[in-house]
């Protein structure tokens, strides 16, 4: 991979100022139990669930820590060294890499997850770090909030940083949506969903490299 040398301090600050408030607001709502995330476990005899942050769980401690501006800045705009420190922090909160697994019905039946009551519709509340992080940073922030076209334009890359051969220009035609390069998560969002919109983890790349 080729080094991306177009990143500037001003670019990082603009990125933080644009997205930090939204992320922080979601974090606070999760901490206060105001957001529940619908889901289900199993294919037959499905269990209706709602993911919800329970106080003093690892999920709660992570959100409480990284909702603070200095830590949130590291999460969104930190160097690679700082992102690796965040991963180590998560591993210390949740040992044995359990946070990387998605919730399963079998593990639920073994009472592996924290049950936090039953909602009025009969859905059971569980606190599962990976599922909640994926909803916040991938489903909500990356898919719906992140202005991907603006992000790519500001970086100003012309050649794919992975292969160094394919062009990744943005094509704009009057009356048509702009055609933009793919954005790859260098550290995969399936394993590290909390880095879903971390600036340095977002790599504009060509179609071929994104499919590898």
Question: Which residues fall in each region the model found?
Answer:
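N-terminal accessory alpha/beta regions
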Residues: 1-140
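Short secondary-structure capping/junction motifs at helix and strand boundaries
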Residues: 123, 143-145, 170-171
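Short Cys/His-rich Zn2+-coordinating modules
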Residues: 135-148, 184-191
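Short, flexible, mixed-charge glycine/proline-rich loop motifs
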Residues: 146-156, 194-199
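The −1 position to Zn-ligating cysteines in a subset of zinc-ribbon hairpins
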Residues: 159, 182, 205
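Short, cysteine/histidine-rich loop/knuckle motifs that typically chelate Zn2+
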Residues: 161-165, 208
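Histidine-centered nuclease catalytic patch
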Residues: 167-201
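Short Cys/His-centered divalent metal-binding micro-motifs
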Residues: 202-212
């Amino acid at each position: 991979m080729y080094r991306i040398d177009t990143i500037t301090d001003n670019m990082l600050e603009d990125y933080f100022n644009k997205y930090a408030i939204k992320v922080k607001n979601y974090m606070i709502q999760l901490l206060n139990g105001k957001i529940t995330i619908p889901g289900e476990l199993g294919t037959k005899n499905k269990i209706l669930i709602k993911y919800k942050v329970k106080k003093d769980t690892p999920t709660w401690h992570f959100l409480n820590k990284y909702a603070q501006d200095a830590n949130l800045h590291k999460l969104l705009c930190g160097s690679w060294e700082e992102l690796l420190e965040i991963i180590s922090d998560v591993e210390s909160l949740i040992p044995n890499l359990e946070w990387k697994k998605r919730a399963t019905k079998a593990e639920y039946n073994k009472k592996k997850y924290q049950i936090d009551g039953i909602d009025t519709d009969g859905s059971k509340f569980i606190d599962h770090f990976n599922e909640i992080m994926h909803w916040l940073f991938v489903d909500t922030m990356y898919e719906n909030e992140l202005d991907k076209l603006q992000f790519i334009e500001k970086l100003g890359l012309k050649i794919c940083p992975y292969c160094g051969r394919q062009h990744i220009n943005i094509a704009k035609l009057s009356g048509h949506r702009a055609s933009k390069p793919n954005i790859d998560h260098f550290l995969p969002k399936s394993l590290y969903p909390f880095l879903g919109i971390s600036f340095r983890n977002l790599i504009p790349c060509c179609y071929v490299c994104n499919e590898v």
